[in-house]
A protein has these predicted regions:
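Alpha-helical transmembrane segments and their membrane-interface exit regions
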Residues: 35-45, 92-104, 213-224, 276-282
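Short, hydrophobic transmembrane alpha-helix segments
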Residues: 15-29, 261-265
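C-terminal ends of transmembrane helices
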Residues: 43-53, 97-110, 169-181, 224-229, ...
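Alpha-helical transmembrane segments of multi-pass integral membrane proteins
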Residues: 93-97, 102, 118-138, 157-173, ...
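N-terminal membrane topogenic signal
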Residues: 1-11, 62, 242
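Membrane-interface helix-loop-helix junctions at boundaries between adjacent transmembrane segments
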Residues: 55-62, 74-133, 141-151
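Membrane-water interface signatures at transmembrane helix termini and the short loops
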Residues: 183-223
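Hydrophobic, membrane-inserted alpha-helices
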Residues: 11-17, 68-77, 189-198, 255
Length: 300
């Protein structure tokens, strides 16, 4: 996993290089390409993951698993339509926890289960509020398009400061109880500084793409392939892609239809993030279950 993280850091600096050479429009196009490939791909094999988890516990019928999964996605879509403020709030919370869990789970910090979950959520919220505070105009526009609620910069600032304070308390607590993690914490603080630079100089979509793909999706793909097939190599990765391909294509077709119906940028961004949210809810639950299962399987 450390090699994967190092690759992600190198790719992030390559993303900064793109920012310095190309226009904002190019960043947006490239960002969507990355999201529609690696980003969608990393969440396209949830059904297979559920099957792998079931194989290790109790086998669940495929149609039952698929029905529950689609019902969860459908419920998220309906919630976004009728209760957009609630849906967006839940999306941010689920995404924050999901990002934090993926980023920290492999570190083996030996924290209590409750503290770990709180820390994952707070770290993920810190990343998201950093993204929001450094791209306020675009964020305010997208939130207004989704919810018809108009935020201002102060709302984003207060959310960031509150999250930063909570993160500081968590880090201090970890260092007091587990001083052996000092090098890990210092490295993570440096990586957060890198994110600040990336988010500051990039457009919202490109900044989100860099984090979502290089820092989240690629490490997640590694974890998923290793969990399903027991190893990560060229053969297992292609098996993963082959299994994910039908779900990936369906997702792309859905996004393409939405784009051709709503070509207005703001509306499309709103629908795009709503779509990401709809698949995030079940995906986050599946990944949490995967990590829980790995803890009970020493060979994983």
């Amino acid at each position: 996993m450390n090699k994967i993280i190092n690759i992600s850091i190198v790719l992030s600096f390559a993303g900064l290089w793109v920012t310095s050479l190309f226009s904002g429009d190019f960043e947006i196009v490239l960002g969507f390409i990355l999201i529609f490939t690696f980003g969608i791909l990393h969440g396209s094999n949830d059904i297979l993951l559920i099957g792998s988890i079931s194989d290790k516990t109790v086998k669940q019928p495929f149609l039952r698993v698929l029905s529950i999964y689609l019902l969860t996605v459908g419920l998220a879509v309906v919630t976004f339509y009728f209760l957009p403020v609630l849906a967006l709030s839940l999306f941010i919370v689920f995404s924050a926890f999901h990002f934090g869990e993926q980023h920290w789970e492999h570190q083996n910090l030996n924290l209590s289960d409750t503290f770990s979950k709180a820390f994952y959520l707070i770290y993920g919220m810190l990343v998201l509020t950093l993204l929001f505070i450094l791209n306020p105009n675009d964020v305010i526009e997208v939130v207004a398009a989704i919810t018809s609620v108009t935020l201002n910069y102060d709302h984003l600032l207060y959310a960031f400061l509150f999250t930063l304070a909570a993160f500081g308390i968590c880090v201090a607590s970890i260092l007091i109880k587990h001083n052996e993690h000092q090098s890990v914490i210092l490295k993570e603080l440096f990586l957060l500084l890198v994110l600040v630079i990336i988010f500051k100089v990039s457009t919202l979509i490109w900044a989100f793409a860099i984090y979502f793909i290089f820092w989240h999706s690629i490490p997640s793909l590694f974890e998923q392939v290793q969990f399903i097939y027991g190893t990560f190599d060229k053969s297992s990765f292609w098996k993963y892609c082959k299994n994910a391909f039908p779900y990936w294509m369906i997702s792309l077709m859905g996004i393409a239809i939405v784009y051709f119906i709503f070509k207005d940028n703001t509306i499309f961004y709103a629908l795009f993030f709503s779509f990401i949210a709809a698949v995030t809810f079940p995906h986050a639950l599946v990944i949490t279950k995967m990590f829980s299962n790995k803890k009970t399987q020493p060979n994983q």
